[in-house]
Amino acid sequence: MIGRLNHVAIAVPDLEAASAQYANALGAKVGAPQDEPDHGVTVVFIELPNTKIELLEPLGEASPIKAFLEKNPAGGIHHVCYEVADILAARDHLKAEGARVLGDGNPKTGAHGKPVLFLHPKD
């Protein structure tokens, strides 16, 4: 069921500074910031040869990333994204195995126009 690693998402307190660090110090290809209001974040994708890193900064006071950064002021890994062939079948299988799907359980549209779901971090 699990496919390739799509990206590792890192919450950061300063998106501009983190982007500059990846571009200048590490020579990475850093994309332009894009607001994702449905998810309460501004994101920047960093292209790597085998996957991507997604930097996340809060967008608005209700952002889940704002709450994450309040608990982890320096930032840190927020989630790992895997690709699956059928997101609804994967959701149903994981729920049957006891995983908790966050939100209303239905996919939202992610940063690249693909459907996404989030599982509880302890699952």
Put a short name on every predicted segment:
Residues M1-S19, G75-V84:
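N-terminal beta-strand motif that seeds the catalytic metal site of vicinal oxygen chelate
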Residues A17, D35-H39:
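Short glycine/proline-centered loop/turn elements that form peptide/ligand docking sites
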Residues A18-A23, L94:
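Conserved active-site tyrosine of GNAT-family acetyltransferases
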Residues N24-V30, G98-V101:
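Conserved acetyl-CoA-binding loop of GNAT-fold acetyltransferases
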Residues G31-A32, A62-A67, G103:
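A short, acidic/glycine-rich surface segment
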Residues Q34, V44-E47, I53-E54, Y82, ...:
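Vicinal oxygen chelate
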Residues L55-V80:
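Helix-adjacent hinge/juxtasegments
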